[in-house]
Amino acid sequence: MMKGSRFKLNQNHAPIHEALETFRRMRVVPFDVPGHKRGRGNPELTEFLGQKCVGVDVNSMKPLDNLCHPVSVIREAEELAADAFGAAHAFLMVGGTTSSVQTMVLTACKRGDEIILPRNVHRSVLNALVLCGAIPVYVNPEVDQRLGISLGMKREQVEKAIKEHPKAVAVLVNNPTYYGICSDLRAIVKMAHDAGMLCLADEAHGTHFYFGGGLPVSAMAAGADMAAVSMHKSGGSLTQSSLLLTGPDVHAGYVRQIINLTQTTSGSYLLMSSLDISRRNLAQRGRQIFHQVADMAEYAREEINAIGGYYAFGKELVNGDSVFDFDITKLSVHTLDIGLAGIEVYDILRDEYDIQIEFGDIGNILAYLSIGDRAQEVERLVSALAEIRRRFRTDGSGLLSQEYIDPQVVTSPQDAFYADKCSLPLRETEGKVCSEFVMCYPPGIPILAPGERITAEILDYIEYAKAKGCNMTGPEDPDILRLNVLTGRE
């Protein structure tokens, strides 16, 4: 039993799931929302999703608790999650890990506060700065010149940022990056705490760290104050479900208030029960599962590197600082040596081989391995990559390689987003201050954020990424032929 818990916690239980099954057997007559009334009002939807699914798509009620103010089965599920993940508190989130990340930032920061963070963060972090008015203090990461990817934050960079900005309220860390790169989280937590700052971890891609021997340290084990954990990415829950974990020194009641500022009052029981069931699964079998996932990824790395022309990178990148550790479950592959951009290999895999990988960028692809993968699918991916090399290999002249461009920050994201602005053709924006986001999605790391100066290098990158077929989002103009820039600001 957790300290202060009124429930006898048992990781074999899934209280939300069990309550829904009990509710289903009661055959309650619904005169509440949702209006499909257990699927009867929308037979096409019921046929598509199944009666069992729509039958538990229900509203909050006494026997099922309320996500905004949980006191029974949801509260117990949250305490079970906290126990399983080694946290003081856990919150079930139904707005994706975007909502978890934004809650962390909004909990730590008020308007005018400074927050230390790497620039290669997910858009949700910078969106939170637009909402709360906090000021980013960027620690620009090193770049691996061969791979063109940004690495982790070096300890001396974080220490320097803390000394130069002693009034900053928090340090935010990616654990890991999309490519599997980990910073020295324990050291950064200690530096932040010694300076009286919170340490926040974006663990959207690190759920398995809590259940895997030989994997990088989890945020809670490292002593971080808050962590946003994307259960649906590698933990098996439904898309859009997430966990927010907090340490013992974070006021859980205040965090709940922050969550309720933006989270829906109609929390999906499909999402919540998927978190509940998936937590139980990981608590019971997580270590075994992720050991198998790691073995599959290591096997795939060896096979892909044996093809020639590809570089499936791994633990050899670890240098004790900017790459303090590496997540071996991430199957990231450099493709430029076969003359193809990552996004081109991504498209070929989908269009020619019916294989959907997570993303392709300028120089790399990522195949996401998790609890649902099997050896035969890995073999199919390896075979497809070998055939792509044989069929499509070129000399690669004219390919860009760099994924990260240091930003020139002129004003805060909030001030820039809400400032007077005008729309200019893309090439006429050079030297201006951007008032909107521009990013390839996935991974959703902004090329430009509000308040940053637009340079010729950035414009070249945008045009190149568009030409290669990257899915670009953010600006008002969906074709990204124009950008909004601040008026009267150079």
Language-model segments: which ranges?
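Short glycine-rich or small-residue beta-strand-to-loop segments that form or flank ligand, phosphate
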Residues: L64, F91-M93, V171-N174, S332, ...
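Conserved N-terminal alpha-helix of the aminotransferase class I/II PLP-enzyme fold
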Residues: V54-G96
